[in-house]
Amino acid sequence: MTQSTSVSKGGRVSRKAKKNPDGTMSIVDHLRELRTRLLRALAAIAVTTIIGFIWYEHGIPAWAIGPLHVPRLPSLGEILKEPYCSLPPSARATFSADNECRLLATSPFEMFMLRMKMGGLAGLVMACPIWLIEIWRFITPGLLKNERRWTLSVGTIAGFLFVLGVVAAYLVLPMGLDVLLHLGDSTQISALTGEKYFNFVIALILVFGLSFEVPLFTAMLNLAGVVHYEQLKDKRRIMIVVIFIFAAIATPGQDPISMLVLALTLVVLMELALQFTRIHDRRAARHVSEWEGLSDDEASPLKVAPSSIPAAESIYDGDHKGIAGGGDAHPAGGSGPIPKPSPVTAPTRAPSASESPTPTPSPAPSDSPTSGSHHAPPAAVLRRGPRSWNDSTGDNDGKPGQDTIQSSSFDDVL
């Protein structure tokens, strides 16, 4: 991203950052964009905080537009003290002349600080669409399409679970206070200060809200392949015990009502997460290859049994004559069965031009009882031994006039 300078008609210099075609940015450009996003988010939070500061003392009256009737919205102060004021008068101290339920302040700045805390918290909640959009626009360019989809889905589910936890904490708060403030009411009477009461409520809300995110975290670990359903199934009882211990320690009031509500809700959510991991593992098992579950030092299974090979079809036609049989090498039309090859004959040596024909000698008289004529050997005879070709008509094994071919496997082939 580069920066360009332009001069307006009024003489004012404006600097606009040009975006690179490939979407890359330098570190300075990233810091500049981060500063812009933070300033926008802080400006929105500041405006909504002012609205929350005013809303702390003044509720929004009821109004109606045609058939639509909107009831009165109580002030933030009334919403904050509602769980405490729902207790019976015998469980809380009342120091006002009109016997109105109010929180106790023991320092000059306690009222102002409580109002600022409630206004800031309300402003943060009311401005959440703006600062969430700014965060999303800052991180979106660095994410792929599937990463954007997963981030948006996980963020939406996480926000819903946190809000569900906040609502559950607010509903459990009166019952928890009722149990805690009646444990020693015969000896003491409660007079809660605004600061301690606010800290107690915020702690309970955060515990419930963050605890409701544990099932989502478990499902994400399963999607990442860290944990599986079989592992969680074997440790289900241990998980339930751990959840009850966590609920007993994490709830700020240490009352059994808050502990039981938090523990039972977490058990139900964890069971839903377990069923999600079971379905996901079952679907993933259908697409897992045989070697994906093996470690690095294990060999993958091989299929040693060869598959059956079909018999080859004959390329010859029984009715077609080969070359040796007088058929054509290429049938008419350029297609058809390939002719059979002609049989291989024994090689013969043709006489060269320099060689002159040798007269055939007359056969020598023989004393053998067999009568008959004896033909002269050819000029070249194929022999087996030191000499491959014998051009002479000399003796063979001391018997002149007889040159024979020794029998061998090679002769049989020929």
Curated annotation (Swiss-Prot):
It comes from the Bacteria. GO terms for biological process: intracellular protein transmembrane transport; protein transport by the Tat complex. It is a multi-pass membrane protein. One of its GO terms (cellular component) is TAT protein transport complex. The keyword NAD does not apply. It is found in: Cell membrane. InterPro entries: Sec-indep_translocase_CS, TatC. Residues 345-357 have a biased composition (Low complexity). PROSITE patterns: TATC. Residues 323-336 have a biased composition (Gly residues). Pfam families: TatC. The chain crosses the membrane at residues 45-65, 119-139, 157-177, 200-220, 238-258, 259-279. Belongs to the TatC family. NCBIfam families: tatC. This is Sec-independent protein translocase protein TatC. It comes from Corynebacterium kroppenstedtii (strain DSM 44385 / JCM 11950 / CIP 105744 / CCUG 35717). The lineage of its organism: Bacteria, Bacillati, Actinomycetota, Actinomycetes, Mycobacteriales.
